[in-house]
Amino acid sequence: MAFTFAAFCYMLALLLTATLIFFAIWHIIAFDELKTDYKNPIDQCNTLNPLVLPEYLIHAFFCVMFLCAAEWLTLGLNMPLLAYHIWRYMSRPVMSGPGLYDPTTIMNADILAYCQKEGWCKLAFYLLAFFYYLYGMIYVLVSS
């Protein structure tokens, strides 16, 4: 059982994916609160917007790590979400800060539903990725 760079990448990905799972859960709860009018859109967008860039950077860091470790299957599984993150960030509303959510448009029913679906899809992806990274870490540690 040897400790390789690929094993380190999977271990770090496990820890950071747990963080991304909490981000996705926070995202889902925040949009549910908006849907049920528990919180106003300005406050909610002010708490959600600072989480966007760290989430995207953590995921991009995964992709760079797995590229350097030559874990091609793992990189291939992460590329669609990375491409979506890049597209989503490039097509964000024009604002003064680096966020995605505009308080003036977030309460539109279609945008709110889209953001909720996005949160659930990301939660599913991060949960599946967490268990895949766990499997990959064990496989790399045992096989080398």
Swiss-Prot record:
This is Protein cornichon homolog 1. It is found in: Endoplasmic reticulum membrane; Golgi apparatus membrane. The chain crosses the membrane at residues 11-31, 57-77, 123-143. It comes from Pongo abelii (Sumatran orangutan). The keyword Transmembrane applies. Pfam families: Cornichon. Interacts with AREG immature precursor and with immature TGFA, i.e. with a prosegment and lacking full N-glycosylation, but not with the fully N-glycosylated form. In the Golgi apparatus, may form a complex with GORASP55 and transmembrane TGFA. The gene is CNIH1. The keyword Transmembrane applies. It comes from the Eukaryota. Disulfide bonds: none annotated. GO terms for cellular component: endoplasmic reticulum membrane; Golgi membrane.
